[in-house]
């Protein structure tokens, strides 16, 4: 059985953990790999390496940092389909959705390449009697990112390129359900010339999350996931005075007025609700057609929803892939059971 590695010293390295999480292919249900629960000893060793790496990286000229990020951008473009395939295989997202999410992440890398301009400070003269004001932007130190299962490339790429561009070292903890994409991105960063241990990847579940939150050597944490976990992260990080950016789960509602274009409204809802199998933070979970448009809207929605081609993620004919796990599927089915009226059930099968 394939064992997923951690990433430090610019390469994938096996964990010494004896505890593992099983990984299953969402399309086939086949068990294909085991993810280690990184131990405290491993974590502390990696943090020690990152502290040394960060102090050197912070003194690297910003033009050099920008150059490495640009090379990383080029490597992503060269390996675009390969990375998208990894996303599809481990998450279940259809290939077109995988490529779209990767492109969104790549746009952030492109933005981070402009770091020489983004890090400029400010100077104000005579803000008070004989007082001038200067402000400068300096690295925080070691930053960490805890990312969700639904966007294995895009969300990590929101986080580490900008953090690293600013002179920080970055520890990435991907979802234990989708670890392989993060490892590939770290490998490409190393290939682009990033020094050892400026970017590391550690695997696990709540065990490694708690180590990150409690570590006094980590200065900031970015998180995307559920609202309860976001609240937990804010609470725990406050104990060690970390800066925190935690994006909790969101719910979108769609209101369809009587004068709306019926075709556009239904197409918009189909994309918003069923894109990426609905596994998006901003997926539309509630739609309210108003007045006389309700029946024609629901009839057209039923017609179009029943035609969505559900299949394996890499099947070119598939328009919607599977949910991430069988447990998640059961959760969604439980919502259907609580509903007042089921219009179509083809996709649920």
Residue ranges and their predicted role:
Residues 29, 65, 87, 167, ...:
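Residue-level signal for inorganic ion chemistry
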Residues 121-264:
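Rossmann-like NAD(P) dinucleotide-binding subdomain of oxidoreductase/dehydrogenase enzymes
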Residues 171, 346-349:
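Hydrophobic heptad-repeat coiled-coil signature
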Residues 228-345:
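ALDH superfamily catalytic-core signature
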Residues 47, 66-69, 73, 84, ...:
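Hydrophobic face of alpha-helices
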Residues 1-131, 324:
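N-terminal Rossmann-like NAD(P)+-binding subdomain of aldehyde/semialdehyde dehydrogenases
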Residues 54, 58, 73-80, 84, ...:
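Structural signal for hydrophobic packing residues in well-ordered secondary-structure cores
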Residues 26-34, 194, 218, 255, ...:
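Conserved C-terminal structural/oligomerization subdomain of aldehyde/semialdehyde dehydrogenase
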């Amino acid at each position: 059985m394939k064992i997923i590695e951690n990433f430090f010293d610019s390469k994938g390295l096996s964990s010494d953990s004896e505890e593992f999480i099983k990984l299953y292919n969402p399309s086939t249900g086949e068990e294909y790999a085991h993810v280690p629960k990184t131990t405290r000893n491993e974590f502390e060793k990696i943090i020690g390496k990152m502290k040394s790496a960060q102090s050197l990286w912070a003194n690297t000229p910003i033009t050099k940092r920008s150059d490495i990020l640009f090379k990383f951008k080029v490597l992503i473009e060269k390996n675009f389909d390969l990375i998208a395939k990894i996303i599809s295989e481990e998450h279940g997202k259809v290939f077109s959705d995988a490529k779209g999410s990767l492109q969104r992440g790549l746009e952030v890398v492109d933005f981070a390449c402009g770091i020489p301009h983004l890090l400029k400070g400010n100077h104000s003269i005579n803000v008070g009697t004989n007082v001038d004001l200067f402000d400068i932007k300096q690295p925080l130190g070691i930053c960490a990112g805890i990312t969700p299962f639904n966007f294995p490339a895009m969300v990590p790429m929101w986080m580490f390129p900008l953090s690293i561009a600013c002179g920080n070292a970055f520890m990435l903890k991907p979802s234990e359900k989708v670890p392989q994409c993060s490892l590939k991105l770290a490998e490409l960063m190393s290939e682009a010339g990033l020094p050892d241990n400026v970017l590391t990847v550690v695997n696990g579940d709540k065990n490694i999350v708690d180590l990150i939150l409690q570590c006094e050597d980590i200065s900031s944490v970015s998180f995307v996931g559920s609202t309860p976990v976001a609240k937990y992260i804010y609470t725990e990080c406050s104990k060690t005075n970390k800066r925190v950016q935690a994006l909790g789960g969101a719910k979108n509602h769609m209101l369809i007025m009587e004068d709306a274009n019926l075709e556009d409204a239904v197409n918009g809802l189909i994309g918003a609700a069923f894109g990426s199998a609905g596994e998006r933070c901003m997926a539309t979970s509630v739609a309210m057609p108003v007045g006389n448009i309700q029946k024609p809207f629901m009839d057209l929605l039923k017609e179009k929803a029943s035609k969505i081609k559900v299949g394996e993620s890499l099947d070119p004919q598939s328009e919607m892939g599977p949910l991430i796990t069988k447990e998640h599927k059961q959760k969604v089915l439980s919502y259907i059971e609580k509903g007042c009226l089921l219009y179509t059930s083809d996709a649920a099968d």
